[in-house]
Amino acid sequence: MARLVFSLNLPSSHGFNLSPRNLQSFFVTQTGAPRFRAVRCKPNPESSETKQEKLVIDNGETSSASKEVESSSSVADSSSSSSSGFPESPNKDINRRVAAVTVIAALSLFVSTRLDFGISLKDLTASALPYEEALSNGKPTVVEFYADWCEVCRELAPDVYKIEQQYKDKVNFVMLNVDNTKWEQELDEFGVEGIPHFAFLDREGNEEGNVVGRLPRQYLVENVNALAAGKQSIPYARAVGQYSSSESRKVHQVTDPLSHG
């Protein structure tokens, strides 16, 4: 938008009154028509001062806003840095406790598993009674015919050991190695053809039944329980599972006459 600028030749008298009436009189009395010294039209740009003022204002607002942003960021940084100094939350403590309990449980399971699989045929032999003593102490007896090379015998060793520990006060447990020529007569007497061969004897030494090979644990448990209770018969008098043939015997001479292995 443009504006008109008038430049008037006014009297130099300092007492001239610039009222509308005097102005009208001035224009009329000067040769009967208004005189204009100059008329020029120019755009209405903003003055440099205005621009500078706005620039100063804008710069002031910008700097103020930037100061506010910097202030807020510094507050955030200080809050984050200060939060690092806070004590750990209770959740972390709980998670650590849960992790510790889990590790302990895993170690317990690992140790118990290792203990079970750590039981060997030598351990069973070491805890077994001599055959002659078992026949003379008036208790029922479980006789296991085994061999060190028998895979099924080794697999069943942990179960046999647990059952022995449970009933050892009421039932004798005897281990006879089929590779030992000392037990040739017993091999024939009990008809051992495969191992492991478990023979169940009453208090007088009479055989009530036998189970051979890999069978469910309950077969052995229920038969031993029947012997301990003094029952006239056992639940599984004849049962055969997967076994190792006694024909694979590695016969060796007896080195210790008292040995039952």
UniProtKB/Swiss-Prot annotation:
Function: Thiol-disulfide oxidoreductase that participates in various redox reactions in the chloroplast. Mediates the reduction of PSI-N in the thylakoid lumen. May interact and probably reduce other target proteins of the thylakoid membrane, such as FTSH2, FTSH8, LHCB5, atpA, atpB, atpE, petA and petC. Involved in the biogenesis of the plastid cytochrome b6f complex. Reducing equivalents are provided by stromal M-type thioredoxins and probably transduced through the thylakoid membrane by CCDA. Possesses low insulin disulfide bonds reducing activity.
Protein family (similarity comment): Belongs to the thioredoxin family.
SUPFAM superfamilies: Thioredoxin-like
Membrane topology qualifier: Peripheral membrane protein
Upper lineage: Eukaryota, Viridiplantae, Streptophyta, Embryophyta, Tracheophyta
Name used for this protein in its record: Thioredoxin-like protein HCF164, chloroplastic
Gene from which the chain derives: HCF164
Organism, as annotated: Arabidopsis thaliana
Transit peptide residue numbers: 1-40
Top-rank taxon: Eukaryota
Disulfide bonding pattern of the chain: C150-C153
